[in-house]
Amino acid sequence: IFGAPLRTAGVVDVLLAFVERIAKTSRSMSLGVLILHAVFFTITGAYYVSYPVVGGMVKDLYPEYHLDRKNLMRTMLDTGTGLAPMVSWSTTGSYTTTTLGVSNLAFAPFAPMLWLSIVFSVIYAVTGIGTAKAKED
């Protein structure tokens, strides 16, 4: 529902231009996609929108930076998993709020696996540890 209007309004192009502007190395590309997906997921609150839209936007850029595309999915899964319960308008956020009876951010300190996935994703992006390189054809 949100993907097409965001593409039509040019939001997707602006976000992609941001990533292309900051991405000078494979590490900055990974970090840029992490930020891009976090922003896009927070706007839409839906995996089924953010994964195909962000993935479709940047999948062709990864080989240019000698990155295997599996890194793209790992980055999006890390940010999506970590943010989903924190975004109150997402399905996961609504569920956790209703089930636990507390605000989304109130349980964050008690769920380190959520935000640690993002922390480790940033560490992997910055250091290059665990980052698969694209195979030469």
Segments from the language model and where they lie:
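Hydrophobic transmembrane alpha-helices of multi-pass solute/ion transporters
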Residues: 1, 14-18, 22-23
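Alpha-helical membrane-inserting segments
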Residues: 2, 6, 40, 120-124, ...
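Short helix-coil transition sites and intra-membrane helix breaks within transmembrane domains
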Residues: 3-13, 41-53, 83-90
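Re-entrant/interfacial helical elements at transmembrane boundaries that shape
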Residues: 14-17, 48-62, 90-101
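Hydrophobic alpha-helical transmembrane segments of multi-pass integral membrane proteins
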Residues: 19-57
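Alpha-helical transmembrane segments of multi-pass membrane proteins
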Residues: 28-41, 65-86, 110-118
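Juxtamembrane and boundary regions of transmembrane helices in multi-pass small-molecule transporters
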Residues: 93-137
